[in-house]
Amino acid sequence: MLNAPTQALLGRPLVGNGANGAPGTGANGGDGGILFGSGGAGGSGAAGMAGGNGGAAGLFGNGGAGGAGGSGTAGAAGAGGNGGAGGLLFGTAGAGGNGGLSLGLGVAGGAGGAGGSGGSDTAGHGGTGGAGGLLFGAGGAGGAGEDGTTPGGNGGAGGVAGLFGDGGNGGNAGVGTPAGNVGAGGTGGLLLGQDGMTGLT
């Protein structure tokens, strides 16, 4: 009874959790209720496609996690979806989805998604970058940790390269009290390649 008018007018319910995105579709998670409710998780991406973004919470609730990027074979791997924002008054933000892995011989890994904004609570952590191709291909960059009014989100780690290729750069730390941790750079190729750079504060 309470949700129907709000849903029709504003496109989201007054109370209730958002729906999760279906796996393999890259669909975004639904937003939670304006007053109470957590955002739904983003759906994982199909092969080579990005994961969906997590849904945002309202005043009270947790942000949905971003969906993982789809693995790449002939083409590039998909990026992870961004985490949803946490509740404005209370709630943890969603973490960014991990970048897709490269299953081919010369394909770069997908980048990790960024963490969701923290509202008044903990910010979301960045997703891990996907691993590069078995022979050639750089690791994906780690997602950035989001800013928060309390602890900032941690940056995601960069992806590891294969035999030839550079490791992905680590994600930057989110601003907060205290600040989040920076993401570590991914390891470069076993035969040739530089390690990724550590994220910045």
Segments the model singles out, each with a brief description of its role:
Residues 1-201:
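Long, compositionally biased tandem-repeat segments
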